[in-house]
Amino acid sequence: RAGFHYIELTATKGWTEHVFPDMPFERLLEIQDLLRRNELIPFSMSGHCNLMDPERIPDFEKNIRLAAFFGCQYIVSSIGEAHLANQAVADDHQVARSVSALIPMLEQHNLTLVLETHGKEHGTGEKLARIVREIDSPRVKINYDTANVIFYGGVDPVQDLKTCLSETAYIHIKDKGGRDDAWDFPALGKGHIDFPAIFEGLEAAGNNCPLSIEIEFTPEGAGSLAAVDQAVADSAAYLTAHGFEL
């Protein structure tokens, strides 16, 4: 109803499981058919796993194959767990080696892994850019989350994005309300992020990466499905008012 034609599926363990590798194949086909009937194209999948933990790599490899099944172009992951406790940590060089080992599978399935600005260790674009540059592959780029860099990294996204524009291939466009450390992520245009400045920076750099809307509300949640629908509609209106096609 809001006018979107593209969707980011989520296979994030313990948080949002739109789809998951252990779902019955028949159920995955039903979801695929549902997307087609509603003319929604799953161009990406959020498949967060701790890429520092060897025991979680097989889970992520399954998510890669699941993303390919749905015809996605991008798979999103934080370096550490997004919403579970980390069972392993590693320095940036170890992370680069671990992620580099995934490149053959990414190439096999024609996917780009976009690493999300998430968590205290990797909460800014500047930090992630160092890892992505070390990996040095077109198959591994940054998913820049505009609100996470405030919440986790304590930086201004307008300035931080300038440090990693060349490495950014995907953006979670998410607004930020309240204090920097408050879990408050409203509809676009309802918070205090200077999105026009971000759009100007992307345009000046010739960066036409896809924008994926993320709305996480407050710890109390949206309150109702109608409130979710309204937030999505408000975000769509905000983007179209700034010249974007949905």
What kind of feature is each model-predicted range?
Residues 8, 44, 76, 114, ...:
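Conserved beta-strand positions in the central sheet of alpha/beta enzyme cores
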Residues 11-13, 48-51, 79-83, 119-121, ...:
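Active-site-proximal loop/turn and secondary-structure-junction residues that shape catalytic pockets
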